[in-house]
Amino acid sequence: TAMGGLNMNALELQGLTKHYKDFTLGPLDLTLPGGTICGLIGENGAGKTTAVKLLCGLYYPTSGEILINGKSSRDFSSDSYFNLFSAVFQDYYFMPMTIAENICTASDYDRKKLFAAFDKAGISEKINSLPLKEKTYMIKDVYKDAADFSGGEKQKLLLAKAIYKNAPVLILDEPTAALDPIAENEIYSRFNSFVQNKTAIYISHRLSSCAFCDKIAVFDNARLVEHGTHRELLGAGGK
């Protein structure tokens, strides 16, 4: 891995803030020991996704520190920092390219590894049913012969993309598009089985979907208002 064999990356946010014109996130303080699965919950606009994009280095914080195994994010080269995270965000758009090109770059293409990722994400049956398999184009508006994917199948492709990258820290933004409960449950359990021995963050709107997480942090109004285990938060009357 990017950390010289360290797959259990401890994450720490120290007084992290982000100022926009009319919005300030934080200050956020959160410690996740290596190997923790943490749920981040809160309403839309509560700051969860912004916090995670700060953690991934996609946004720069206004103040505060991010530590990975005690080392400041500022002390990493941008490439080595980027390689620490596999993140699946809901605002991701598939490009009008082949399925394979949407999952990995040409220089990184490994067919065996790609199909292992499809398998773990539960989408290999669909890919194998297509005449051109992973070389099938996506996006019907651009290519007449492109494959159609349901909301649940797109989620699985996003999960396959994160699995293919296989970074030490995995982040999954809960599907905002309504998936049926069975499809949603399948995404949780596949995510859960894949993140064994990794540090993982699961972004959700509901406490109930984070029952599998070791720790849950609750966002409200751009602040971290409480954190604990699923049971502790239920006991505290968490929403």
Residue ranges and their predicted role:
Residues 13-16, 23-33, 64, 134:
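Conserved beta-strand
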Residues 170-174:
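Catalytic Walker B motif of ABC-type/P-loop ATPase nucleotide-binding domains
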Residues 64-71, 81:
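Conserved ABC transporter NBD signature motif
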Residues 56:
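Helix-to-loop junction immediately C-terminal to a conserved catalytic motif
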Residues 133, 189, 211-239:
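C-terminal portion of ABC ATPase nucleotide-binding domains
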Residues 43-46:
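Walker A (P-loop) phosphate-binding loop of ABC-type ATPase nucleotide-binding domains
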Residues 67, 124-157, 166:
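ABC-fold ATPase nucleotide-binding domain signature/coupling loops
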